[in-house]
Amino acid sequence: AIFLIMKEKRTYVREPVKINIPSMIPPVVANAALTSGFFHELNFVDDVDWMGDSYVLHQFKDFKVVDSAQKLQKGQFRKECNPEDLMVFSFYPTKPLGGSDGGMIVTDDYEKYKWYKEAVLNGMSYAENNWDRGISFPGYKMYMSSIQARILLNNFKTFDKKMRVLKQLSDTYNKEFGYENTSQHLYRIEVLDNKKFINKMKQLGIVCGIHYPALHLNDVYNKNWKWDCPKSEVLQNRTVSLPMNEKLSFLELEYIIDKVKENI
């Protein structure tokens, strides 16, 4: 979805520009920006506070792009965006509303909506009869499959309950570990050495993760540039994500909390 957003902008802005993104971010965001052909350069910033919330991915002259990231709430677009803006939602399997990957672009701008609707369907205009569709421009085969849609529709049925359970889980973690985390996708804490901590937890049967390594230090993106991201450089070795699953039983949660406390 992020890739497609930049492709749409590229159709009428010919000069590529620089994009500012947090260094601690999933590589998919950086990759989408670069491969879209719109942005020729990444500028990594030392923003470590965006996690758990949506954030402005890019501010164009006439509208902004918001990545909902780990957040999904009723009426979110109207609360955070103007009609001409774009908001991206991810259906990654472990996100609040998970599917079999893919995502969604939301806008109240009809011209943008029309372009995306055609772009994801091979650049073809819409018609009730498939054979009456015309080719507007070279597009992409990026529309949601029936299987993806079915999985999402089924997950919608239990979405409210899932959010309530995840909030209770986050609140319990906050109480036990002294944090004020609000994300219902990732629960991150700091340890002295996240790799050692993760290996120890794995031995105890607890799977944790790192969200995320600092991309500005990765050779793929670092073309001899030096970015001032001291917080990201520290946190990439200290941040760790605890299990965040609505299926966790009380005994499993109690076990996780006890073992984390023993090893931090």
Where are these regions (language model features)?
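PLP-dependent aminotransferase-like
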Residues: 7-68, 72-75
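Short beta-strand segments
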Residues: 151, 184-191, 209-213, 241-243
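PLP-dependent enzyme catalytic core of the Aspartate aminotransferase-like
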Residues: 223-264
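Short, conserved alpha-helix that lines the donor NDP-sugar binding/gating region
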Residues: 2-7, 170
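Conserved PLP cofactor-binding pocket of PLP-dependent enzymes
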Residues: 70, 125-131, 196-228, 234-240
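Generic structural signal for small/hydrophobic residues in well-ordered secondary structure
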Residues: 1, 19, 37, 67, ...
